[in-house]
Amino acid sequence: MTIRVAVLGAAGRMGSTTAQAVRDAEGLELVAEVDAGDDVAALAGRADVAVDFTLPDVTEANVHALLDAGIHAVVGTTGWDDDALGRVSDHVGRTAGLGVLVAPNFSLSAVLAMRFAAQAAPYFASAEVVELHHPRKVDAPSGTAVHTARGIADARGAAGSPPMPDATETALPGARGAVVDGVRVHALRLEGLVAHEEILLSNPGELMTIRTDTFDRASFMPGVLLAVREIADHPGLTVGLDAYLDL
């Protein structure tokens, strides 16, 4: 059965890459390319799944409109907070089996790096995350870095790990980065980059670094297409592509 796909934010870099990937994919049909000013509700009856690569200030409204239209939503736009996720979870729970996937990253290497970091975290005394992106990215830290930090914190909490050592008493504002559930996260914005992340885990006398580098947006497309094909089998709200993988 052919899956009918709409792309929201189709004029953007990720949106246009996604639209082309859908055109080229077997078993998928691109039925709409939606941009600012277009009516999302008009997709009702035309699309089975919509992929959202828009902006943080509109993506939640887009998801609610898609759910009202009976359309599964695959969301790659970052900037989501717990309140917004809670509202979407409540809404999708009132639908007849629709699914919403909010994925901080569709790169398979990034998804695996997040999983590896969570698995390793209980065995190390310290962990910090450094994310590096192009200077046009509008949110910091990245959704990937936040998701990574939360995974580390959850794993350490489940293992009963003690607080991470840090004797810093004075620092310039921001010098030690943001704190996500007790994990320090640092955001760099440099021209020439696309998307990169380093996860540093250490013990006395040793350091392990998990690094993932994205050089081209095409690297996200296998994950996006996987999500489009699998979302109907995952009703409700899912955060993170790893839930769709057999890990």
UniProtKB/Swiss-Prot annotation:
PANTHER family cross-referenced by the UniProt entry: 4-HYDROXY-TETRAHYDRODIPICOLINATE REDUCTASE 1, CHLOROPLASTIC-RELATED, DIHYDRODIPICOLINATE REDUCTASE
Protein name: 4-hydroxy-tetrahydrodipicolinate reductase
Family classification: Belongs to the DapB family.
Binding site for NAD(+): 9-14, 76-78, 103-106
Catalytic activity: (S)-2,3,4,5-tetrahydrodipicolinate + NAD(+) + H2O = (2S,4S)-4-hydroxy-2,3,4,5-tetrahydrodipicolinate + NADH + H(+); (S)-2,3,4,5-tetrahydrodipicolinate + NADP(+) + H2O = (2S,4S)-4-hydroxy-2,3,4,5-tetrahydrodipicolinate + NADPH + H(+)
Gene Ontology cellular component list: cytosol
Protein EC: 1.17.1.8
Entry annotation: catalytic residues: 133 (proton donor/acceptor), 137 (proton donor)
Molecular function GO labels: 4-hydroxy-tetrahydrodipicolinate reductase; NAD binding; NADP binding; oxidoreductase activity, acting on CH or CH2 groups, NAD or NADP as acceptor
Entry keywords, A to Z: Amino-acid biosynthesis, Cytoplasm, Diaminopimelate biosynthesis, Lysine biosynthesis, NAD, NADP, Oxidoreductase
Function: Catalyzes the conversion of 4-hydroxy-tetrahydrodipicolinate (HTPA) to tetrahydrodipicolinate.
Pathway: Amino-acid biosynthesis; L-lysine biosynthesis via DAP pathway; (S)-tetrahydrodipicolinate from L-aspartate: step 4/4
Record bears the keyword NADP: yes
Subcellular location, record wording: Cytoplasm
TM region(s), chain numbering: none
GO biological process entries: diaminopimelate biosynthetic process; lysine biosynthetic process via diaminopimelate
Keyword Nucleus recorded: no
Binding site for (S)-2,3,4,5-tetrahydrodipicolinate: 134, 143-144
Primary gene name: dapB
Organism: Beutenbergia cavernae (strain ATCC BAA-8 / DSM 12333 / CCUG 43141 / JCM 11478 / NBRC 16432 / NCIMB 13614 / HKI 0122)
